[in-house]
Amino acid sequence: MQVKCSYSSNDSVFTLGRVYDVHIVYGNEAHRVSDCLALIDNQDEIWIFRPTYRGGEISGIDFSASFERY
């Protein structure tokens, strides 16, 4: 799945209008981490992606971004 950034509180992290690939991150049973969806930002950092009907969201300390399905 691909999503397009529709809002970013910091353009150096996610660029407005840019298309990003949604990646599946598989959990590690030893660490009890479940599978999740993730996006990779402009600096190659991984963010947990919370999907919604229209796209999805990312949030962190002093940062948020919204995405729409592309």
Model-derived features with residue positions:
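Extracellular interaction modules
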Residues: 58-62
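Short intrinsically disordered terminal tails
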Residues: 1, 65-70
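Basic/aromatic-rich interaction segments and small domains that mediate binding to polyanionic partners
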Residues: 2-57
